[in-house]
């Protein structure tokens, strides 16, 4: 586990620091690819003090890492470190995909523990392409249904191998690689676009192993039993209830997202108790949402405008 800090690139800096919670199965550099194609860089130039979690590549000895470890220990430790390092009492969290789900679980549990009278460390919550309702993940639910033996997979490997994760994601859009190659050929005369797409394509194949304990819980509690939406998801001794979340919430979604379809993500804004809540749909796909042309032209500016109003 690493916590990265990026220094703002301007003189006037917003008071509230930002912590980015990345996915468990992908490298975090999709949010900081290269100068000009970096959400982190964009936020720094706008005056935000940015921190980002890198969960690391789990080894065999990490096979028992669980949601409890991430939601009740590792993520809160990062929150506390950001606050102590920045000298502030509150922060904004931006969570991408599974990272957004981890942030939601922590936010719900932390809010429930504090009740309505105590303001916690979370000032704003931004989720990007975050699934909360597994009924909207039909392909994954079918594939990992009752006949799928996750215990055999984990007994053999400890953690879910990166290659297995990659094949699982590719199965959601079987002809995606062919379509992507055809699209690149059609844009071969536009070097900047080609280079951008190649960078994103390289990242999509750079998966990391899925911690075995977390995978077991995600398959059973999230995919099969849909515990978050049904109000039955317990992380350790704590219940994760979306209705406990009351902080300002922004959910950024991709119109053509095959990994987090709208049916799996739309309930987030509907189920929280926040009076200040907003959902923004951006044209494009799951990766393009955070690093493509649509991100640069639409998503990043929308994110910056929303955070700026709530970070004084």
Predicted features along the sequence, with ranges:
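Gly/Ala-rich beta-loop-alpha elbow adjacent to hydrolase catalytic centers
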Residues: 94-103
